[in-house]
Regions:
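Short coil/turn segments at secondary-structure boundaries
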Residues: 35-43, 63, 145-147, 216, ...
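Sequence-specific dsDNA recognition surfaces
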Residues: 20-39, 53-82, 221-236, 244-276, ...
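A short beta-sheet element
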Residues: 50, 75-78, 82-135, 269-272, ...
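Short, small-residue-rich loop/turn micro-motifs
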Residues: 52-55, 90, 159, 247-252, ...
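A short glycine-rich beta-alpha junction/loop motif
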Residues: 105-113, 148-177, 297-304, 335-359
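Extended hydrophobic-aromatic, low-complexity segments
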Residues: 291, 314-316, 328-331, 357-362, ...
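Non-catalytic DNA-recognition/assembly elements of restriction-modification systems
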Residues: 1-33, 162, 166-234, 351-404
């Protein structure tokens, strides 16, 4: 039974451990989800926050989708306010971010859960604690078990409301939040360093690709093997699931132009298994994203792999596709432009200057990418440290009491 709001402050000041369902957590005013029928993109409309916009604890979207004013007016319950916590409900279940001034007045898509807090909840840090708790192994495990689906796991908002939230004693909660704040400051610095290094590599490519009008351009299939993605087998019984399988979402949602881990593996098929260094490509409405795989990988259905003759040429292709990301709609197909046309991709004309130009570019770009990737790898380690901090010290009886 939900406690009266007047009791919330007392519970939030408690010096004992407590376990709640999210919908009953003191300081939480509402748990809901976004617009079900958003309609078509309206360039003059209200920004719509989508699951893809929530990346690594931030809202990473400078060009959001937009909905018509009348649709927004019909869905004012999900009009974003400062301090709201938004949670991914499809795909990367549980990724979250707090809304800042820049997103006030936006609306939210069906793929996003919305948690609104009371004034007391914000004053006692329930918003900050919940955002961190969603990174705890216990919370991650619970969410994955309650999100049915394979290619696009989906968490119903009814399940989100039942998420177990462990509330530590006030002093311990404050101590944990302070330590995690320090870790996140380091992660933010690393993210900025990585972004700046990649921006420098993009700028170097732009200078390197300036050439006379008659300089050579070639069909992509002439400079790289174009490999179509495959579906994940339904079962791998008796087979060694030995190689990473990259879903389109993992390419699209990767941090930086790198893929170094996937959620699933499969037996390595000879025709489509790719060594590290391959360029992976995946489309979504309005753009195509390209990343370099840092691990051996099989491209999943809805993606394609580009296997250049060497890693240096792979870097050139990566930046060629990055520079044209929003102009490659012709290689996307399907109702939602989420399938890739390998034929169209193979025919795509790419700039291909002489070997010395490509090598000269790659010598500089590879150093910048190494710097960016090192920073992002450290962020992964720091993320694991946050999970450990959240999990350590949980009383054993609560660890076993967390429902599955």
């Amino acid at each position: 039974m939900r406690r009266p709001a007047r009791d919330h402050q007392a519970w939030l000041q408690s010096q004992t451990w407590s376990l709640y369902e999210l919908g009953d957590l003191p300081g939480v005013a509402a748990v809901t989800y976004g617009v079900v029928r958003a309609g078509r993109h309206d360039p003059q409309g209200v920004p719509l926050l989508q699951a893809r916009d929530i990346v690594d604890g931030t809202i990473a979207q400078s060009d959001p989708a937009r909905i018509a004013e009348h649709i927004h007016a019909e869905n004012l319950r999900t009009r974003l306010e400062r301090g709201d916590l938004v949670i991914v409900l499809i795909g990367r279940i549980g990724d979250s971010a707090l809304i800042g001034e820049d997103q006030v007045g936006w609306n939210t898509a069906r793929s996003v859960g919305l948690v609104r807090f009371t004034e007391v909840g914000r004053a006692w840090g329930v918003d900050e604690w919940l955002r961190r708790w969603l990174k705890a192994p216990e919370a991650r495990g619970w969410l994955s078990r309650h999100a049915p689906g394979s290619a696009h796991a989906t968490l119903p908002v009814s399940a989100l409301r039942k998420l177990p939230v462990l509330l530590p004693p006030l002093d311990r909660r404050r101590h944990l939040l302070h330590g995690i704040d320090l870790i996140e400051q380091r992660r933010q610095l690393n993210t900025q360093r990585a972004a700046h290094a990649v921006e420098l590599a993009d700028a170097h490519f732009e200078r390197s690709s300036l050439r006379p009008a008659d300089a050579l351009s070639r069909p992509l299939a002439e400079v790289a093997a174009v490999i179509n993605g495959v579906a994940l087998p339904k079962a791998t019984t008796g087979q060694d699931a030995s190689i990473a399988w990259a879903a389109p979402a993992e390419v699209l949602q990767s941090l930086g132009p790198y893929l170094d881990r996937t959620a699933r593996t499969m037996p390595a098929p000879e025709r489509v298994a790719c060594a590290q260094g391959v360029v992976l490509v995946a489309p979504r409405p309005g753009e195509v994203k390209a990343v370099i795989s840092r691990i051996p990988v099989v491209p999943g259905r809805g993606t394609a792999a580009l296997r250049a003759g060497n890693d240096l040429d792979g870097l050139w292709l990566l930046h060629e596709l990055r520079s044209r990301s929003r102009g490659l709609g012709a290689i996307a197909q399907g109702v939602q432009a989420r399938e890739i046309s390998v034929k169209a991709l193979s025919r795509l004309k790419v700039s291909w200057p002489d070997t010395e130009v490509r090598r000269s570019f790659a010598r500089v770009a590879s150093l910048l990418h190494d710097r960016a990737y090192t920073a992002l790898k450290e962020n992964h380690v720091l993320g694991e440290l946050i999970s450990t901090e959240l999990s350590d010290g949980v009383p054993s009886h609560y660890r076993t009491a967390l429902p599955g």
